[in-house]
Amino acid sequence: MLYIIKPFLQKLRYLLQLLLTQIVGWSAECHGSWFTRIIIKLFILFYKVNMQESLQQDIAFYKTFNAFFIRYLNKNARPINSNPSVIVQPADGIISQLGTIQDHLILQAKKHFYSLEALLAGQTRIINYFRCGNFTTIYLSPRDYHRVHMPCNGVLRQMIYVPGNLFSVNPSMVTHVPNLFARNERVICLFDSNFGLIAQILVGATIVGSIATIWSGTVMPPREKVIKCWHYPKFGDKNAVILLKGQEMGYFKLGSTVINLFRYGRIELCDHLYTNCITRVGLPLGYSNKKI
């Protein structure tokens, strides 16, 4: 009997997560005037959001909750490290894990690992690039700035949408749900760079209304059940998508996680970084083993 009930319960849980996400996403786009302002005020108070960093500090400026959530920061709020040999932190949040990829296994939490194959949806060519390389996982809490930036100069070569679950990605869930990041919906972005091929992966979660990139707009929704791939021209082509270090590359409407993958032998992660340390866009994340 259990083998019949279990798939049904899993499907029901997914549908409830999807329904909740759609309701929250719809609500966050509603133009509610006074109601929207009340929700924003309560959110700021509850999560202790630092509005002094925001480009627009008057909450009356924000016509929807999502407009507030993806607010811009002041121009000088996140200075970008200009050393060309340094890779910078792509998002505000905390480092939930970082370190070396153990052949093909990435640490999710203590005693929990997930595979490159699962995270990268079986894309064999890409998987082999990152074996034994380095990774970082940054969790964006509701209070954080939710625009994601480039860790280095890069030329976009591929974007992959991977359908999946919508588990919460808060620290408690990450500790208890096996293979969480490899099971959740996500958008994988691959860039050629002076540090070799790098991956920047935006992971969806419960109540993440959407994920968007600056070159394609909203990637999800619509939520689909098939893997979708987009390929982009290399450097030198007039249609190449070139992004500079510190430049915005996308955003979350409600919080989630950013995972970065780096090739073996191309970078060293900064010694001062550790699990649960705070990250800020533009601060050093790692550095090249060779002069750039």
Curated annotation (Swiss-Prot):
Where does the record place the catalytic residues? D92 (charge relay system), H149 (charge relay system), S256 (charge relay system), S256 (schiff-base intermediate with substrate)
> Reaction catalysed by this chain?
a 1,2-diacyl-sn-glycero-3-phospho-L-serine + H(+) = a 1,2-diacyl-sn-glycero-3-phosphoethanolamine + CO2
Q: Which GO terms describe its biological process?
A: phosphatidylethanolamine biosynthetic process
Specify the protein's topology with respect to the membrane: Peripheral membrane protein
GO molecular-function terms, A-Z:
phosphatidylserine decarboxylase activity
Q: Which residues carry this modification: Pyruvic acid (Ser)?
A: S256
What EC number is given for this enzyme?
4.1.1.65
> By its UniProt entry, which InterPro entries does this protein fall under?
PS_Dcarbxylase, PSD-B, PSD_type1_pro
**Cysteine pairs bridged by disulfides in the record:** none
Looking at the UniProt record, the site noted as Cleavage (non-hydrolytic) sits at G255, S256
Cofactor(s) needed for function = pyruvate
What processing steps or modifications follow its translation? Is synthesized initially as an inactive proenzyme. Formation of the active enzyme involves a self-maturation process in which the active site pyruvoyl group is generated from an internal serine residue via an autocatalytic post-translational modification. Two non-identical subunits are generated from the proenzyme in this reaction, and the pyruvate is formed at the N-terminus of the alpha chain, which is derived from the carboxyl end of the proenzyme.
**Where does the protein end up?**
Cell membrane
Q: Which GO terms describe its cellular component?
A: plasma membrane
Q: Which domain of life is it from?
A: Bacteria
**Alphabetical UniProt keywords:** Cell membrane, Decarboxylase, Lipid biosynthesis, Lipid metabolism, Lyase, Membrane, Phospholipid biosynthesis, Phospholipid metabolism, Pyruvate, Zymogen
Q: In which pathway does it act?
A: Phospholipid metabolism; phosphatidylethanolamine biosynthesis; phosphatidylethanolamine from CDP-diacylglycerol: step 2/2
Function of the molecule:
Catalyzes the formation of phosphatidylethanolamine (PtdEtn) from phosphatidylserine (PtdSer).
Self-association and partners: Heterodimer of a large membrane-associated beta subunit and a small pyruvoyl-containing alpha subunit.
Q: Which family does it belong to?
A: Belongs to the phosphatidylserine decarboxylase family. PSD-B subfamily. Prokaryotic type I sub-subfamily.
Protein's name in the database: Phosphatidylserine decarboxylase proenzyme
Query: Where is the organism placed in the taxonomic lineage, from the top?
Result: Bacteria, Pseudomonadati, Pseudomonadota, Gammaproteobacteria, Candidatus Palibaumannia
